[in-house]
Amino acid sequence: MSRYTGPSWKLSRRLGISLSGTGKEIEKRPYAPGQHGPNQRKKLSEYGLQLQEKQKLRHMYGMNERQFRTLFNRAGKMKGVHGENFMILLETRLDNLVYRLGLARTRRGARQLVNHGHILVDGKRVDIPSFSVKPGQTISLREKSQNLAVVGEAIEVNNFVPDYLTFDADKKEGTFTRLPERSELSAEINESFIVEYYSR
């Protein structure tokens, strides 16, 4: 299954969660897209709830099914709670941390920065969005990319950096100081549904 590249607002409304991170798409029209959107929310089966939760999280991080399932399986081999480990591994993705630092306004925008070679990890260029950043590693912009308008605009509007990151806006550089706690991650996701979905 390929990664979704269609209109993110329409998908956000279908899943009932903001994929842009701004919440505007849900705030403006808090119902599914289509002619009968306001009236077509129906009660989902147990399987439907599990599938919806998986789709929410997969699209939130902009991953295809193969990438998502591979990371899920990796989380299952770690000590601790499978679902929580999965959420934490997702958070360590380079494109996600570029977004969390405020260098991009959306995860999609962060993924483009990484793909186009604008991002350094510990001073070395990394152009793989799924690269897993380790605690203690530093994320920064290439010298030639320091004055990108999209980055400056993103930093200007960002007013929150998670406690597991530090960020120097002048240097446009951040450090992933530690792994996040589950309580610091999205409360809109019930990862136990995803574990149940893949355990069928």
UniProtKB/Swiss-Prot annotation:
Residues 92-152 form the S4 RNA-binding domain. CDD domains: S4 (cd00165). The keyword Ribosomal protein applies. GO terms for cellular component: small ribosomal subunit. Keywords: Ribonucleoprotein, Ribosomal protein, RNA-binding, rRNA-binding. The keyword Transmembrane does not apply. It comes from the Bacteria. Residues 22-41 are annotated as: Disordered. One of the primary rRNA binding proteins, it binds directly to 16S rRNA where it nucleates assembly of the body of the 30S subunit. With S5 and S12 plays an important role in translational accuracy. Belongs to the universal ribosomal protein uS4 family. NCBIfam families: PRK05327.1, rpsD_bact. This is Small ribosomal subunit protein uS4. It comes from Lysinibacillus sphaericus (strain C3-41).
